[in-house]
């Protein structure tokens, strides 16, 4: 059963993370406003809490799993380059010198 879980994608790109954060905050804010208004009109603070908790659960369901909508802009990594500085002796390396500010 665990091999099925390891095949699931777990990454989100940066734009997907931003979208997920905006959606999460928007849903929480909307549910808080609706919950406050309904709780005020019904004169029941419990309904306010229930509506906010339902909004939180709904936003978690929409934003925590890495849905395909959050993976539309994958990162393009640079190819691996051989570092030739490891092969050089200390005397052969270029020394970087910084200009002194007066």
Swiss-Prot record:
Disulfide bonds: none annotated. This is Signal peptidase complex subunit 1. Residues 81-102 are annotated as: Disordered. The chain crosses the membrane at residues 20-42, 47-69. It holds the Pfam family SPC12. May be phosphorylated. Keywords: Endoplasmic reticulum, Membrane, Transmembrane, Transmembrane helix. The lineage of its organism: Eukaryota, Metazoa, Chordata, Craniata, Vertebrata. Component of the signal peptidase complex (SPC) which catalyzes the cleavage of N-terminal signal sequences from nascent proteins as they are translocated into the lumen of the endoplasmic reticulum. Dispensable for SPC enzymatic activity. It comes from the Eukaryota.
């Amino acid at each position: 059963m665990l091999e099925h879980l390891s095949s699931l994608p777990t990454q989100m790109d940066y734009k997907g993370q931003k979208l997920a954060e905006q959606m999460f905050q928007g849903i929480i804010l909307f549910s808080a406003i609706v919950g406050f208004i309904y709780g005020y009109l019904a004169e029941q603070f419990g309904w306010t809490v229930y509506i906010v908790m339902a909004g939180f659960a709904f936003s978690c369901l929409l934003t925590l799993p890495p849905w395909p909508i959050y993976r539309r802009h994958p990162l393009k990594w640079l190819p691996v380059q051989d570092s030739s500085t490891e092969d050089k002796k200390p005397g052969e390396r270029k020394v970087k010198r910084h200009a002194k500010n007066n």
